[in-house]
Design a protein with these regions (language model features):
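Short, isolated positions in well-ordered beta-strands
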Residues: 65-68
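N-terminal non-globular leader segments, chiefly Sec-dependent signal peptides
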Residues: 1-50, 71-107
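A short, compositionally biased
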Residues: 52-56
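Short aromatic-centered micro-motifs
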Residues: 59
Length: 107
């Protein structure tokens, strides 16, 4: 029984979806997907909760495993800023969030 399970695991780990131009937002990955049976190639998706990242190349979510391609360049730059100047980076995050906040409809 273990041999069958190990073979299934090996097959599953080589057949996972790929995310490009991704970023991590509130515990979810957002990026352009390919090879996902539930989404068309080139679609932008929001994953379920990220449970683990393995060697910066694979992410396990509640529903699927993703191979990580290149991150979003703006998001990568923000991470570099956070390492070099956390206060400045927090101001940028606050500005980014205020720009991307959902519109509120006033009646």
């Amino acid at each position: 029984m273990n041999v069958v399970n190990n073979a299934a695991v090996a097959r599953a780990t080589t057949e996972h979806a790929r995310l490009e131009n991704w970023q991590l937002i509130r515990g979810h990955l957002v990026g352009t997907v390919s090879g996902d049976p539930d989404h068309g190639d080139g679609e932008t998706i929001h994953t379920s909760d990220v449970l683990a990242v393995v060697k910066h190349r694979h992410a396990h979510t509640r529903n699927r495993e993703y191979q990580l391609g290149s991150p979003d360049p703006n998001w990568a730059r923000l991470l570099q800023l956070m390492r070099s100047s956390p206060d400045a980076a927090l101001e940028l995050v606050a500005l980014h969030n205020s720009i991307h906040a959902p519109a509120v409809r006033i009646r």
